[in-house]
């Protein structure tokens, strides 16, 4: 079966033919590639084509596809059982592994997705502060729970619908939206609203494209939250163990009240978490009145994969230096080639994360990102795919370097960029 036929058949039985909207390739005027398997830095579609994969399952695969250590850990766990709905030693082991490197985090709760993590973190913040409103930033995506699907990035931005039908006005009215990297917009909202339970932010935004928050902005944001008895939530579902081993904390050293984790923490399996100091976490049920639960939360396969992934990342002390150098080589190479061709391009990388925008102006917030030439991006994406390079099919997503990549792969990619730019 070909990709084209597979998508046509999928559309008969699956809403939109995909189980997450951006996978449909609708905004790049193409059909999705149906993947048969992956190995290292590569994925292979059912038509027999191979691609250098810079999506890496949208970030979780720090060590690429079919990493032997993670596979071995999963196989060992599966041999004992896939799920029990009861505590296992693996949960405590992964909890200790995560918390050991964050001095301000004392307890953690595992869930199955980033959406669950951010949704639960906000409920926890509201329960702890006894306040109702939350403040988020335009273009930041924190999953698809109702209160957070307001002025969102990621797939919502890709389909030009940063909010969603079905989100009730009575829910959305409690969500305040500030401008990313603009502290004055935050101050204005705090002046007008005295019941803000929490501020949630991607400290390294990856869902409007890659846009890091500025150090002074984050420092001032933390001060404002502290002065107003408002909890600061860092959504590190994407940037955790990607921007550095300690995520944004390893770069900006700002201690958020709550951190959400995901993607890499599950090693490619469904796992996420939220963590905070004990006085906050202890109001979660069964100790306190904030309810949160999940049938597959902390399931042994995901815990085993997470332990293998984080243990390997922690041991390989030079891993993040290598990934950062490759991301830098890729983005600087793209910028040089664009300049030679006279194409408008802004590039960025943080650790193993990278982004690029087809615009002549620097990008520091969502409105800047929206100035990108989407038609140009679509042509570029199609050309790159034809040249064997698999990039996220959206201008508003982040790319990822994995440990199985090297200089040769980056050189191959840059040659594809050169050829793609020639055809634009």
Curated annotation (Swiss-Prot):
Gene3D superfamilies: Aspartate Aminotransferase, domain 1, Type I PLP-dependent aspartate aminotransferase-like (Major domain). It is an enzyme of class 5 (isomerase). InterPro entries: 4pyrrol_synth_GluAld_NH2Trfase (IPR004639), Aminotrans_3 (IPR005814), Aminotrans_3_PPA_site (IPR049704), PyrdxlP-dep_Trfase (IPR015424), PyrdxlP-dep_Trfase_major (IPR015421), PyrdxlP-dep_Trfase_small (IPR015422). Its EC number is 5.4.3.8. The modification N6-(pyridoxal phosphate)lysine is found at residue 263. It is found in: Cytoplasm. It comes from the Bacteria. Its cofactor is pyridoxal 5'-phosphate. Pfam families: Aminotran_3 (PF00202). Keywords: Cytoplasm, Isomerase, Porphyrin biosynthesis, Pyridoxal phosphate. SUPFAM superfamilies: PLP-dependent transferases. One of its GO terms (biological process) is protoporphyrinogen IX biosynthetic process. Pathway: Porphyrin-containing compound metabolism; protoporphyrin-IX biosynthesis; 5-aminolevulinate from L-glutamyl-tRNA(Glu): step 2/2. Its main location: cytoplasm. One of its GO terms (cellular component) is cytoplasm. One of its GO terms (molecular function) is glutamate-1-semialdehyde 2,1-aminomutase activity. It catalyses: (S)-4-amino-5-oxopentanoate = 5-aminolevulinate. Homodimer. Belongs to the class-III pyridoxal-phosphate-dependent aminotransferase family. HemL subfamily. This is Glutamate-1-semialdehyde 2,1-aminomutase. The gene is hemL.
């Amino acid at each position: 079966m070909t990709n084209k036929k597979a998508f046509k058949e999928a559309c008969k039985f699956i809403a939109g033919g995909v189980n997450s909207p951006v996978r449909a390739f609708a905004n790049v005027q193409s059909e999705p590639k149906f993947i048969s398997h992956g190995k290292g830095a590569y994925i292979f579609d059912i038509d027999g084509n191979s691609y250098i994969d810079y999506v890496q399952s949208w970030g979780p695969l720090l060590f690429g596809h079919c990493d032997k250590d993670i596979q071995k850990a999963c196989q060992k766990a599966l041999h004992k059982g896939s799920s029990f709905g009861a505590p296992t030693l693996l949960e405590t082991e992964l909890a200790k592994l995560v918390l050991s490197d964050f001095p301000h985090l004392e307890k953690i709760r595992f869930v199955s997705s980033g959406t669950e993590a951010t949704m639960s973190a906000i409920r926890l913040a509201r329960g702890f502060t006894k306040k109702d409103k939350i403040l988020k930033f335009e273009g930041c995506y924190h999953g698809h729970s109702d209160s957070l699907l307001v002025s969102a990035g990621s797939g919502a931005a890709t389909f030009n619908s940063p909010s969603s039908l079905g989100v009730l006005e009575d829910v959305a009215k409690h969500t305040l939206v500030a401008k990313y990297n603009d502290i004055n917009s935050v101050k204005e909202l705090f002046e007008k609203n005295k019941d803000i339970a929490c501020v949630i932010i991607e400290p390294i935004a990856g869902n409007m494209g890659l846009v890091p928050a500025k150090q002074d902005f984050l420092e001032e944001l933390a001060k404002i939250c502290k002065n107003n008895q408002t909890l600061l939530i860092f959504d590190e579902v994407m940037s955790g163990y990607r921007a550095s081993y300690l995520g944004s904390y390893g770069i900006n050293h700002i201690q958020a009240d709550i951190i959400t984790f995901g993607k890499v923490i599950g090693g490619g399996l469904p796992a996420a978490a939220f963590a905070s100091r004990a006085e906050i976490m202890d109001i979660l049920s069964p100790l306190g009145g904030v309810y949160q639960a999940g049938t597959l939360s902390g399931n042994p396969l995901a815990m085993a994969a997470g332990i293998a992934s984080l243990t390997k990342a922690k041991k390989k002390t030079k891993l993040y230096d290598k990934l950062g150098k490759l991301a830098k080589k890729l983005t600087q190479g793209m910028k040089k080639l664009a300049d030679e061709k006279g194409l408008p391009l802004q590039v960025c990388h943080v650790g193993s994360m990278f982004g690029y925008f087809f615009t002549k102006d620097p990008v520091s917030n969502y409105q800047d990102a929206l100035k990108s030439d989407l038609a140009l991006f679509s042509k570029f994406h199609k050309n790159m795919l034809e040249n064997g390079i698999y990039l996220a099919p959206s201008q508003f997503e982040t790319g990822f370097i994995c440990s199985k990549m090297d200089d040769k792969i980056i050189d191959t990619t840059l040659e594809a960029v050169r050829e793609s730019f020639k055809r634009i």
